[in-house]
């Protein structure tokens, strides 16, 4: 019985498998319109329009709104600021850590 099924399948391709597989790109049936012809007619009027120069003199901006009042004009001594903060105890925190897996082994 299996010999008959093999004979029938030798010359027949599965229609669902036609679009599948490597090496076959899907066919694109869309018609491409040439944008060069259409845009050349419209762009003629656009090319004649001159751009107006920007007149941005920064007169409207108040620098008090831009620069914070706490740091404006101050000289910061970073060495002194570091001493005032004190020592970081980050190294000590690592020594106190106990892994939960170690507790389970006991």
Curated annotation (Swiss-Prot):
The species this protein was found in: Phaeosphaeria nodorum (strain SN15 / ATCC MYA-4574 / FGSC 10173) (Glume blotch fungus)
GO cellular component: nucleus
Domain of life: Eukaryota
Biased composition range(s): Acidic residues: 29-62, 85-106
UniProt KW Chaperone keyword: yes
Composition bias type Basic and acidic residues, residue spans: 17-27
Name of the protein: Histone H2A.Z-specific chaperone CHZ1
Keyword entries, A-Z: Chaperone, Nucleus
Polar residues composition-biased segments: 1-11
Family per record: Belongs to the CHZ1 family.
Localization: Nucleus
Function: Forms a chaperone-bound H2A.Z-H2B complex that acts as a source for SWR1 complex-dependent H2A to H2A.Z histone replacement in chromatin.
Coiled coil: none
